[in-house]
């Protein structure tokens, strides 16, 4: 399991701790990942995802998992999230046709 957000693609970043004497030591900045269960209204199902706290706020801001995924760029999403996005878009198209 990698330290990357499944929805936004946020990963580990590297930098320095800088002391008062300007000594620099390498460190890692880890994303604030949470195991969250999100509900898809279109699919009538809940999905467990490992996403950053920032992604949780973004999902709520866009009005839920379905809206977030339909507007999200595929290159930021994990493979699992891309598959879910394709299923949601397909199901929305079926509902619109019916």
From Swiss-Prot:
Keywords attached to this entry = Ribonucleoprotein, Ribosomal protein
GO cellular component terms? cytosolic large ribosomal subunit
| Top-level division of the source organism's lineage | Bacteria
> In the UniProt record, does the keyword Ribosomal protein occur?
yes
The record's section on Gene3D superfamilies has:
Ribosomal protein L28/L24
Q: Mind telling me which SUPFAM superfamilies this protein's record contains?
A: L28p-like
Q: Which GO terms describe its molecular function?
A: structural constituent of ribosome
> Which BP terms in the Gene Ontology apply to this protein?
translation
Family annotation (Pfam families)? Ribosomal_L28
Q: Tell me the NCBIfam families matching this sequence.
A: L28
Q: Which PANTHER family match?
A: 39S RIBOSOMAL PROTEIN L28, MITOCHONDRIAL, LARGE RIBOSOMAL SUBUNIT PROTEIN BL28M
HAMAP family linked: Ribosomal_bL28
Q: Which family does it belong to?
A: Belongs to the bacterial ribosomal protein bL28 family.
Q: What is the designated name of this protein?
A: Large ribosomal subunit protein bL28
Q: Which organism is it from?
A: Bartonella bacilliformis (strain ATCC 35685 / KC583 / Herrer 020/F12,63)
């Amino acid at each position: 399991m990698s330290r990357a957000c499944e929805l936004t693609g946020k990963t580990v970043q590297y930098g320095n701790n800088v002391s008062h004497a300007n000594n620099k030591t390498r460190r890692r900045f880890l994303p604030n990942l949470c195991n969250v269960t999100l509900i898809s209204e279109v699919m009538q199902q809940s999905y467990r995802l490992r996403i950053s706290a920032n992604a949780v706020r973004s999902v709520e801001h866009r009005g839920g998992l379905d809206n977030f995924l339909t507007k999200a760029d595929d290159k930021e999403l994990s493979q699992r999230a891309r598959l879910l996005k394709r299923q949601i878009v397909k199901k929305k198209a079926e509902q619109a046709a019916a």
